Swiss-Prot record:
InterPro entries: Homing_endonucl (IPR027434), LAGLIDADG_dom (IPR004860), ND/Mrp_TM (IPR001750), NU5C-like (IPR003945), Proton_antipo_N (IPR001516)
Region described as ndh-5 exons 1 and 2 encoded: spans on this chain: 1-239
Cited function: Mitochondrial DNA endonuclease involved in intron homing.
A GO-annotated cellular component: mitochondrial membrane
Miscellaneous: Encoded from partially processed ndh-5 mRNA that terminates with the in-frame coding sequence of the second intron.
Compartments, record wording: Mitochondrion membrane
GO molecular function, one term: endonuclease activity
Family: In the N-terminal section; belongs to the complex I subunit 5 family.
GO biological process entries: ATP synthesis coupled electron transport; electron transport coupled proton transport; intron homing
Keywords annotated in UniProt: Endonuclease, Hydrolase, Intron homing, Membrane, Mitochondrion, Nuclease, Transmembrane, Transmembrane helix
Protein name as annotated: Probable intron-encoded endonuclease 4
Enzyme Commission identifier(s): 3.1.-.-
Transmembrane segments: 1-21, 30-50, 81-101, 119-139, 140-160, 177-197, 200-220
Length: 545
């Protein structure tokens, strides 16, 4: 049983990686998921057997290094600490595998991804169960290699390759210190076996013990991206921030978790308390304890688009200036993501009656950072005027002389502006009609952007999207509507620049219908039932509003 815990994820990875074309996408998904789930079940059994009964299990497979100076065995130790650590590692890995089936369903390289993911799990198990430092180092390096492979999963993207290389090289700093610590242990005790080291530890010179401890600590800090060695983490988000690097994905963006508004409100309260604690420690109302660098242009343009829809530049009656984004509380996770990416600002409950949260920035230095983002990069006419007045007020209040840059920016399908604007002002709809000429059904899909005023801007968006602009008198604004036959460029766009709010849930159902319609499978009775199911999910969803 204990060997199965170690071997099963490796077998799943080998099958998905080397025989992916034979077993197919579904086969690779099924084999890797089953191997990890079975491993999790076995680990739970091991937890009861070893943890409760306190009966450690040691497996020595073979001698790895055998010399007159030292002996290293390829062995594994299952004690109370090991099985306790295996439980969260394998449960989380199982959930990641299962969720990735739908999350990566549109990617053509599923087999490779699931192979990497199972290999990651295998290396984690090696890291946790090894009974000596050298074998632990093998698992340690394996986790680093798998992280590199996952971050650079889309290897045709330069940013992904740069991000993976940054993560890989930064982790080598930690590996260097870990290796030094291991050599000091070997030089001092002549053995790397845990049992030997722990039994002789009380007799080691205190200075040497301190050196060993510091080296091992720095190694762990680099691997877990702690202070000073965290610089690779923001770039590592490039690989799977928007798709499938789920072990580094912000949990508040998880579309499955987003389906539970009650749980989401609870998460928001936890975030509020965490923000308060961090603010208290740092003696600051806005600067977070771990500032993420704004390096990726995708976030910059997504953020600008989102703010043009839902943000505001406020000149308060009391004289202070403020930047604010307001969202309903069930969608507050996007505000926490923005705060995390920018590295400053406050997210808090705004209105208990209307159930809203807001992201707010008032600090002068952070407002200057926001000015550098928006100045000259705003598209909507009304937002340009608002920003210009706000910037003039800022210069007067703080006696600054920041020039206003007239914006000539025009959105296109080569940056994330439209994704952000859609998260704020877009929706996806589906209608099913009877065909009067025959028994077949007509399925109508639409992508809609809405905005009050800004007629010329909406006309431009209609032009680049291949849609039409409609005047809505009751709304005193305009809709840009793109119908089924013109949706292909938009679908390709959202594959490159995915939505970040819970509208992704609606889009996920909508795109399934789109694929059936494009493949002309929508009139199959079974598929028609699926379409009606997806349609109901779209139309009843609050996330599409």
């Amino acid at each position: 049983m204990y060997l199965s815990i170690i071997i099963l994820p490796l077998l799943g990875s080998i099958v998905a990686g080397f025989f992916g074309r034979k077993v197919g996408v579904s086969g690779a998904q099924l084999i890797t998921c089953l191997s990890v789930i079975i491993t999790t079940g076995l680990a739970i059994l091991a937890f009861f057997e070893v943890g409760f009964n306190n009966i450690p299990v040691t497996i020595n497979l073979f001698r790895w290094i055998d010399s007159e100076w030292y002996n290293i065995l390829w062995g594994f130790q299952f004690d109370s600490l090991t099985v306790a650590m295996l439980i969260p590692v394998l449960i989380i890995s199982s959930l990641v595998h299962i969720y990735s089936i739908s999350y990566m369903s549109h990617d053509p390289h599923n087999q490779r991804f699931f192979s990497y993911l199972s290999l990651f799990t295998f290396m984690m198990i090696i890291l946790v169960t090894a009974n000596n430092y050298l074998l632990m180092f093998v698992g340690w390096e394996g986790v680093g290699v798998c992280s590199y492979l996952l971050v650079s999963f889309w290897f045709t993207r330069i940013a992904a390759n740069q991000s993976s290389m940054s993560a890989f090289l930064t982790n080598r700093v930690g590996d260097c210190f870990l290796t030094i610590g291991m050599f000091v242990v070997l030089w001092t005790l002549g053995n790397l076996d845990y049992a030997t080291v722990f039994s002789l530890a009380p007799y080691i010179n205190s200075d040497i013990a301190t050196i060993i401890g510091i080296c091992l600590l720095i190694g762990a800090m680099a691997k877990s991206s702690q202070v000073g060695l965290h610089v690779w983490l923001p770039m590592a988000m490039e690989g799977f921030f928007s798709r499938a690097f789920l072990k580094l994905h912000y949990m508040q963006e998880h579309p499955v978790l987003s389906l539970g508004p009650l749980r989401f409100s609870l998460f928001g309260k936890i975030q509020d308390q965490g923000q308060f604690a961090g603010n208290s420690i740092r003696s600051s109302s806005e600067i977070t304890s771990e500032a993420f660098m704004l390096k990726e242009s995708w976030f910059k343009w997504w953020f600008i688009g989102f703010v043009e829809g839902d943000g505001s530049f406020i000149i308060n009656k009391d004289g202070y200036l403020e930047f604010r984004i307001t969202q309903s509380s069930p969608d507050a996770q996007i505000l926490f993501m923005i705060k995390k990416e920018l590295g400053f600002g406050v997210v808090r409950k705004q209105d208990s009656v209307r159930n809203t949260h807001c992201y707010r920035v008032r600090d002068k230095n952070n407002l200057i950072k926001l000015i550098s983002i928006f100045n000259g990069n705003i598209f909507l006419d009304t937002r340009k005027e608002q920003f210009k007045l706000w910037l003039n007020a800022f210069n007067l209040k703080y006696k600054e002389n920041i020039p206003h840059i007239d914006s000539s920016f025009r959105p296109n399908l080569d940056n994330a502006w439209l994704s952000g604007f859609t998260d704020a002002e877009g929706c996806f709809t589906c209608s099913v009609y009877d065909n009067k000429s025959n028994t077949a059904k007509l399925v109508r899909l639409r992508y809609i952007l809405s905005q009050k005023g800004n007629s010329s801007c909406m006309e431009y968006l209609a032009e680049i999207l291949g849609g039409k602009k409609h005047l809505l008198k009751s709304y005193e604004g305009y809709n840009v509507t793109v119908n089924t036959t013109k949706l292909s460029p938009i679908v390709q766009y959202f594959n490159l620049y995915p939505l970040k709010t819970k509208k992704y849930i609606t889009y996920f159902n909508w795109i399934k219908i789109y694929k059936l319609v494009i493949d002309k499978k929508h009139n199959d009775p079974e598929n028609l039932l699926l379409i009606m199911k997806y349609k109901n999910n779209i139309n009843k969803s609050d996330y599409n509003k």
